[in-house]
């Protein structure tokens, strides 16, 4: 399992506004153990994602 910021089709992090429930639901939908809104980046962070999950590694958001 891996931890990280889930990304969308355009390699952009999932934005949140301090909404932990939104991120937890999003992450669990991606088969993670849990998730929360990381305040410094206003992005969802998932813990316990499957190894093949798409997370932010490098490259710019293409949107």
Swiss-Prot record:
InterPro entries: LCN-type_CS_alpha_beta_dom, Scorpion_toxin-like, Scorpion_toxin-like_sf, Scorpion_toxinL, Scorpion_toxinL/defensin. This is Kurtoxin. The keyword rRNA-binding does not apply. Pfam families: Toxin_3. Its main location: secreted. Disulfide bonds join 12-61, 16-37, 23-44, 27-46. GO terms for molecular function: calcium channel regulator activity; sodium channel inhibitor activity; toxin activity. Belongs to the long (4 C-C) scorpion toxin superfamily. Sodium channel inhibitor family. Alpha subfamily. Has the structural arrangement of an alpha-helix connected to antiparallel beta-sheets by disulfide bonds (CS-alpha/beta). It comes from Parabuthus transvaalicus. GO terms for cellular component: extracellular region. Negative results: does not affect Cav1.2/CACNA1C, Cav2.1/CACNA1A, Cav2.2/CACNA1B, and Cav2.3/CACNA1E calcium channels. The primary structure of the mature protein is identical to that of Kurtoxin-like II from Parabuthus granulatus (AC P0C5F1). Keywords: Calcium channel impairing toxin, Disulfide bond, Ion channel impairing toxin, Neurotoxin, Secreted, Toxin, Voltage-gated calcium channel impairing toxin, Voltage-gated sodium channel impairing toxin. Gene3D superfamilies: Knottin, scorpion toxin-like. SMART domains: Knot1. It is found in: Secreted. Residues 2-62 form the LCN-type CS-alpha/beta domain. GO terms for biological process: defense response. The lineage of its organism: Eukaryota, Metazoa, Ecdysozoa, Arthropoda, Chelicerata.
């Amino acid at each position: 399992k891996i931890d990280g910021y889930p990304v969308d089709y355009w390699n952009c992090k999932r934005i949140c506004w301090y909404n932990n429930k939104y991120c937890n639901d999003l992450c669990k939908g991606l088969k993670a153990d849990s998730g929360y809104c990381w305040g410094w980046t206003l992005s969802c962070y998932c813990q316990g994602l499957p190894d093949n999950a798409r997370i932010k590694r490098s490259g710019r958001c293409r949107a």
